């Protein structure tokens, strides 16, 4: 999986890409992240990449010429890549979107800045627009980092255990069940006995029920699209009655 990131601040990616899972994935050749400094594609000696908006208004707008040149440079190496713009206008990012993007061979991610990009960049190059949520970030770099991390986790071989991705929160539309490790007791709080029983069928049932409970309590909106069995629905109905 290849990621081409178009940014004014490539240094922001140094930490996330050189630690933990992403570092190992890059070392194994499972993912490739290429950073492209948009300033390198400016047409003047001052490397100007933004300008005042036509029609007036506050802030600056990212210029079309350097962005166009930068996108075309990335496309030369990844001609089949989907071009993504990080922007508040975009569709909300989710596990389902990450899974969709993970099926691509390559992604080109444009990191928006300031008041946004010249609209002609959208018209000429952008295939998809993605937002992390209804809040404002300083720039699209942090959104790009989140996209790279979430998508990379779904690339075969990136995680130590394939079950890790399957059991992640949201993988089946539900929040994850509670996790415990040693010691079995801490300050009077004990690990649920079922997890120590060795009965894998009961453990799986406990985890499923706890996942359903957490989702119903914290993110009930997810239940509308979650993959629920008849047993799940009966358990939720019983839990709701017991809580009254």
UniProtKB/Swiss-Prot annotation:
S-adenosyl-L-methionine binds at residues 112, 132-137. The keyword Disulfide bond does not apply. Its EC number is 2.1.1.228. Pfam families: tRNA_m1G_MT (PF01746). GO terms for molecular function: tRNA (guanine(37)-N1)-methyltransferase activity. The keyword Transferase applies. One of its GO terms (biological process) is tRNA N1-guanine methylation. It is found in: Cytoplasm. Gene3D superfamilies: 3.40.1280.10, tRNA(m1g37)methyltransferase, domain 2 (1.10.1270.20). It catalyses: guanosine(37) in tRNA + S-adenosyl-L-methionine = N(1)-methylguanosine(37) in tRNA + S-adenosyl-L-homocysteine + H(+). One of its GO terms (cellular component) is cytosol. InterPro entries: Alpha/beta_knot_MTases, tRNA_m1G_MeTrfase_C_sf, tRNA_m1G_MeTrfase_TrmD, tRNA_m1G_MTases_N, tRNA_MeTrfase_TRMD/TRM10. Keywords: Cytoplasm, Methyltransferase, S-adenosyl-L-methionine, Transferase, tRNA processing. Homodimer. Belongs to the RNA methyltransferase TrmD family. PANTHER family: TRNA (GUANINE-N(1)-)-METHYLTRANSFERASE. Specifically methylates guanosine-37 in various tRNAs. This is tRNA (guanine-N(1)-)-methyltransferase. The lineage of its organism: Bacteria, Pseudomonadati, Thermodesulfobacteriota, Desulfuromonadia, Geobacterales. The gene is trmD.
């Amino acid at each position: 999986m290849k990621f081409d990131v178009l940014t004014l601040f490539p240094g922001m990616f140094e930490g996330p890409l050189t630690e933990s899972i992403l570092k190992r994935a890059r070392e194994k050749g499972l993912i490739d992240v290429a950073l492209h400094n948009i300033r390198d594609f400016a047409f003047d000696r001052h490397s100007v990449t933004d300008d005042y908006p036509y029609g007036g208004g506050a802030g600056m707008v990212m210029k079309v010429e350097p962005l166009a040149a930068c996108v075309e440079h990335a496309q030369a190496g990844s001609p089949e890549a989907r071009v993504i713009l990080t922007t508040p206008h975009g569709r909300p990012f989710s596990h389902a979107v990450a899974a969709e993007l993970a099926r691509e061979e390559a992604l080109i991610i444009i990191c928006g800045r300031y008041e946004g990009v010249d609209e002609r960049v959208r018209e000429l190059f952008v295939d998809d627009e993605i937002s992390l949520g209804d809040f404002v970030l300083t720039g699209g770099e942090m959104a790009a980092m989140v996209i790279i991390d979430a998508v990379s986790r779904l690339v075969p071989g990136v995680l130590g255990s394939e079950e890790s991705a399957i059991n992640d929160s949201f993988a089946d539309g539900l929040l994850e069940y509670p996790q415990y490790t040693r010691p079995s007791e801490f300050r009077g709080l004990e690990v649920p006995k079922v997890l120590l029983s060795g009965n894998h069928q009961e453990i799986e049932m406990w985890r499923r029920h706890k996942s359903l409970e957490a989702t119903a309590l914290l993110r009930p909106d997810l239940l509308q699209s979650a993959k629920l069995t008849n047993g799940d629905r009966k358990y939720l109905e019983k839990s709701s009655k017991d809580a009254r």
